[in-house]
UniProtKB/Swiss-Prot annotation:
Lineage: Viruses, Duplodnaviria, Heunggongvirae, Uroviricota, Caudoviricetes
Disulphide bridges, residue numbers: none
GO biological process assignments: adhesion receptor-mediated virion attachment to host cell; symbiont entry into host cell via disruption of host cell envelope; symbiont entry into host cell via disruption of host cell glycocalyx
Name of protein: Depolymerase, capsule KN5-specific
Functional note: Functions as a receptor binding protein (RBP) and probably mediates the attachment to the host capsular exopolysaccharides. Displays a depolymerase activity that specifically degrades the KN5-type polysaccharides of Klebsiella pneumoniae capsule.
Organism in which the protein naturally occurs: Klebsiella phage K64-1
Cell location: Virion
GO CC annotations, alphabetized: virus tail
Keyword line: Degradation of host capsule during virus entry, Degradation of host cell envelope components during virus entry, Host-virus interaction, Viral attachment to host adhesion receptor, Viral attachment to host cell, Viral tail protein, Virion, Virus entry into host cell
Amino acid sequence: MAFKFKGSLSAVDATLKGGVKFDNEKLPDSKNMPEGKFTINEIDNSSTTDLASNTLVTNFGKQDNVAGMLSFNTGDWENNNSAPVKLMMRVVNNSNDSDWVTIFDSTKTTVTWSSIASAGQTVFTVPNLDFKKAIIYINGILQYPGISYQTFGGTVTFSNSLQAGDNVYIVVGEDSDNTTNTQYISTALDNQTTIILPYEKNSNYLFINGVLQYPNSFTIVNNTITLNSSMQQDDNIFVLSNDKIVPNYTAVAIQDQTDFTITGTIIDPVVYINGVLQYDTHYTISGNTLSFVSKLFAGDEVLVFLDSLNLIDNINTEYNSVIDDVNNSNKINIPYFHFSELQVFINGILQNPDNGAYDLNGTEVTLSSPLQEGDDIHVIVYNSPIQDDNIVTKADLSSYASITELNLLKDSLKAEGINLKWQPHLPSIEVAFGLPRRSLKIWKAGNTSTINQYWLYPVDGTVWSGIGTLGNVPSTPFYKLDSNKDVITWTYTATSDNINRIFVPYNFGSINIFINGVLQNIELGHYTYNGQYIDLNGSLNIGDNLVAILGKLILNTNPYLTYETANGQFVSKSDLSSNTGSLMVGTSDGNNLQQTLNNKVNSVLLSSNNGSSIVGTSSGLSVQAEIDNIKKQFTDSKVLISKLIPNSTQDQTALMQSEVNSLTSGMTYITPTGTILITTVVIPTLKGMTFKFDGTIFKLPDGATPLDSDMIRFNSLSYSTVSGLYTDGNRSNIIDTSGTNPWYGRVINWRLGNNSTFVYFQNTTMVNSLYCGSQWGNNISNIVLDGIYADNIGEHLFYISGNGGGNNKNILFKNMMIDSIGVNPNNSIASHACAVVKSSQTIGLNDYFCIDGLTFKQTQTPGYAVIVVVNGDCVHFDIKNFQVGKNVGGIISPLGTCEYMKVSNGYSLDTTSGVPLVYTYPNSSNIVQTYWVAENIIMPNAYSQINSQLFDVYRDCHFGRIDVSNDQSNTVFKDGKTLKYINCKFTLPTTGLQLTYVLRDISFDNCQFDSTITGNSAVVDYIGQNEYTSNTRVSFNNCKFNSTTNYTIGTFNNLVNLSMTNCYGIIKKIYARNSTSINKLKIANTEFDGTTTPVTATSITMKMLSNVINTSTGRDYSFYRNQWSIPAGQTSIGYDLSSTFIGSISAFSVQVTPQGTYSGPTKYWTVVSGTTVTIYVDVAPTTNMTFNIQVSG
């Protein structure tokens, strides 16, 4: 028997000794073959190879025309035992050509310097490597930090185990305060098309579910991204942004295309196909020609960035690895480097540390998910100072094969037409379904299908045909194909985790297995099978898909089969599922199933009152018995279905109180859909409860006189769920009982009582409350409220906890939508500010409150100010992912201890007016503060951010202006507190930033000042006017000024310590107001714009100047050099250098040297007064006397 190879045998071990194995497979016209696997030498030692004709000739000692599988290692031309790739050839019948199956044998070699990762591996440790940040891809798909992986030190930890063939690619680098890179992470709502970024950058790279979106798939204006098509619920959004503009090249491939001509200058290219990152082993670039190793499909979209995107700071290196054995781990360690930031890719997919894809710990990368055999890991390391005694060269980055060897292997395999990517082997599936050669393609939405084209849907392994445009899932006009009668495709989807043994409901003689579209190799130990059981070397997790192609050889070798069955005349699954299926199944009485059913049970009997007693179930009981059991369980145990009458005009307080009094711990209480009128219902102390209020509206009756009352009061609730609580306070129909105040009364919609813990509230609504929406007691912990809507609330929405309250911890408010609170007119009379959440205590500090996701519109004009948080004695408070309307007075009103406050990812819904972070800072506030930080706050309007000194750091914020005020006497700050603005932008109004109190160091780093200043004000003005603490400094580092006024910085106090370093733009001058002096002035590498006097001050006590340039004079204000001449007959020459030097000139900085010979004078000297320098001689010269003069700043 002869097999002709489609390529050259010179690329493989031509002797085939011990390397070729036969795995029998049965095809329709094949002869019978015994089961088993044989090497060629075992079957026929006379096998030969003819290199000239590329033919393997062997007899096998069996009948001709036998279908089978040949597999052997390719070798690396230097050592045949270290073959990196195993080729498997399917030998079929005359109607189908032979073809290759390509399998990585990663135990032999790897294309990167990293050690080979294990199947199930999540932890990777690399010696001598540290990093702080990483960008990670798995199979070219960007991973989400904090969810997909975590990083710590040198370790990446993935959340979930990776699969065989997954490729990990990591880029690492440092965490720098000076970075221009910004990340935005969010989760999509269903049909969402708009993404609003809390910043503005020149370049924004949008990944959805880790896949890069192409430039023509969305538009971006300012900070708003608009998608051409909508996202689905919970789609992961990840935007990487910076100010680097990188040109790109795009193309759409035609079938089997490999080469593309790139227009533009190629510097450090980054290549994507269909949004998936391609590693440099997948392509080569020669000149402007991009060549892919593998042929592309028609419609594949190619995107090439011509230079590095610099999406992470201080890139050091990259790490790449392929998962190839069976150890159970999920960490990655990056070898040989010290670094502070990295990017991790798994199978080309960028991993995201903030979404939990991995953790870093020293040099150890811990993946959140174990990897599988064949997974490829790639890491780029940034900011990695190499140790002198541990220099890493490029050669060190290859562990087994040299770069030359790997390139030789890649080129040779490419010539053989071998695809080195893990993917379903389409020729194998074509054989199983009897399809023409090269007629099968991978299903991709948007492709056009014509006649005689077939498509493999990779989600479930089914094959489809038809004419039309492919959708997201197969449907009409496409139809699913059945495989050959001799070859059955069976699909299994894991319904739970850790499945490693699977029962196949068929008797089969051979099997090929694909897991999530990846071919598994029994020779590499991926699986074994015994009878109808498959035993996997790893474990499937929920949702994993297994497709088995089963060879039904046993049907043809069973001597007891009838002639009809052997020739395919048997009942198929589709036959049984038809309307006549019951006629094809026989029974023991000689009838078919339909006849037996007709004889045993007639339709009249089944339709009678006791018909349910006749029909049985799998438990052995009748349907009626099963129904009776379910009803009994409801009645006897844990469910109470309320008998409240919905939409009745009667007050049903008494009935509901009676029902809740009968509840015991562990029960479920279900109320009907509709409106229920109640006044006050007290739910007793309970545990393990489920309250299903979905669809019920609890409303206060008209004409009620509530005074101090609660509509729903949970006395004390633990380990319970409350779903759909909707309360309506009916504030427009209550009765005034005070006689003076039409809004008197402290009725609240619902109350959570003392000692409640571990309660989950889902979809909570509060409207029309007279007082607060909800008030809580004390010692409450671990409460989650997810999905909150509120409107027309009299005062606070959540009051936690009022008089007698406190010691409440771990409270999370998620996904809040607030239309209006604080609407009571009495709030104005009492100057009473109201909040979405008010923290208060009298018995102990509250701790760990968090608001995550808030839209606060305030559609009504409030009685007084409304704010997000009134914080009285909550130690930790976190407010993130919020947007507020123009009627909101502020974000925070500090009234007590708050050691840690973080406000992040927030912006104003109105672009014409702003919202201050700090609403008020009263002297009565007993604030104990340790660390406050604001990040990604976008308020680019005219509103001033007052009391800014309460925060320690502002990072990536956009404000109109800022003011600092005096510290109140009761405030206790941490030692060494400073005020920093990092990467901030200020669009100033008609008056500048006012730093009237300089009580600690204030620094502006990488900030931009866009001024609209006119008149006699500065961009940053009145520095230290009211108070300036000695030895404090105001500094501007790497800042850009766009000032059009007559001066840029105005100081006011004689003790000012001012520093400007690496500043640029339109800087007019520094002006000491009110005829004051400057104590200390440092200016370095700074350019002033068009002014003859960069600094105006009565005096400068100490100055340090270097590289201070004035564009109007072109002079360096740290150095002056010239030639002065005393005319014949005169004894002095002098000049005022005030237009050249800033402040007074020291006599020690002046150097004077006579030039050439002269007659008359015997000595000379200099006199310095302020900025005037004069040279004197004792005797007038007879001719002009020239001096070289040099003055340093």
